[in-house]
Amino acid sequence: MNQNFSKKSSNDLINRIIFTIFVLIICRFGSFIPIAGIDAIALGSIAEKNQSGILGMFNMLSGGSLGRMSIFALAIMPYITASIIIQLMSVAYKPLENLKKEGEAGKRKINQLSRYLTVLLASLQAYGVAVSLESIVTNTGPVVIIPGLFFKITTVITLVVGTMLLMWLGEQITQRGIGNGTSLIIFIGIISGVPSAIISMFELSRKGALSPLVAIAVCAGVVILISIIIFFEKAQRKLLVQYPKRQVGNKIYGGDSTYMPLKLNTSGVIPPIFASSILLFPATLANFSSSNSEIMNMLTYYLGHGKPIYILLYVALIMFFSFFYTAIVFNSEETANNLRKYGAYIPGKRPGKNTSEYFDYILTRLTVVGGIYLSVICIIPELLMNKYVISLSLGGTSFLIVVNVVLDTLTQIQTYLFSSKYESLMKKVKLKN
């Protein structure tokens, strides 16, 4: 009986993995289906021109869908943006904050609000894409074959439906597969560009533009970089939490202790993404602008990859968003109040305000180290890309996303296997009884 249960659990895990792979294949297949009315040759030249801008980063996150202007061109970014906006608003807007406290019902309402906002953001972005495409004329001709109202309407509908389909597929992976669906869709998009980046590097080495020793050093550097990311992403500061003893009749209950883990990098990959988006926005405007403004050209030059001003601003913005997003993710006052509510306390700290201030003190130190870690991880690839013209798909943000998704998925698989073994053990105990 126990063997049959274990076999059933194992088959369920395999089915979940197969389902996840199947859905990800659908996502990749959709990224090669172009929207109607586009000149592929003219579009290719524009995509190549914007490789170093914010479009290059979003093209990387979409797995090349934006560069090919496929039905998944907007990728799942509108949904992520909507989720972040709702998360930010839940801190400042009281009704949303109250919804978060309503448990599962509140969570469903917040998810519904995120979907509505996703449709709105995707519609605005899709319309912006349609208008931009109509205004672009290359050496080979206009990008849009027959511009007009019909093209705008069909483009908006196609791109919005594509985003909502990706969002739904991501939810299906989360519910019926393994791992976080949204993260895995971004992950598969990023790694799809890795083979071309490796081929590009070897091509540069073959032509003599990149020495073989440098190519080997870059490969070794990638391995070291991934190891560093894994170390820092798994790093935690454990705070001792004590529960008081309670006497009920002649028996004494409680008195146990546990640990509250605080991640070194609480903010995750959000700070580099936000920082990159802000810094690369002027360069993107310049690429789409037909006028040769001196101010715009100067901004484009000084905010280019690897430039000193770009790096300084990049680090400053990463540090700022690290503190900003950590304050949203971890509410010190709320956590301290929850501990006091359950009778728990930090040894040596009074429950309430004193505990909250202690959390702030610890988080500030962790965030400084975490911000420096994120800055270093993101700057090193920037310098390499600037010097050796390595593809953007090997940027620091890419490494952070890929490693985080892999770690999260492996953790979920381990948790699933552990829970299956636990259920098997409990069933065995019940049978014996």
Curated annotation (Swiss-Prot):
Keywords: Cell inner membrane, Cell membrane, Membrane, Protein transport, Translocation, Transmembrane, Transmembrane helix, Transport. One of its GO terms (cellular component) is plasma membrane. PROSITE patterns: SECY_1, SECY_2. InterPro entries: SecY (IPR026593), SecY/SEC61-alpha (IPR002208), SecY_CS (IPR030659), SecY_dom_sf (IPR023201). The central subunit of the protein translocation channel SecYEG. Consists of two halves formed by TMs 1-5 and 6-10. These two domains form a lateral gate at the front which open onto the bilayer between TMs 2 and 7, and are clamped together by SecE at the back. The channel is closed by both a pore ring composed of hydrophobic SecY resides and a short helix (helix 2A) on the extracellular side of the membrane which forms a plug. The plug probably moves laterally to allow the channel to open. The ring and the pore may move independently. Belongs to the SecY/SEC61-alpha family. NCBIfam families: 3a0501s007. This is Protein translocase subunit SecY. It comes from Rickettsia bellii (strain RML369-C). The gene is secY.
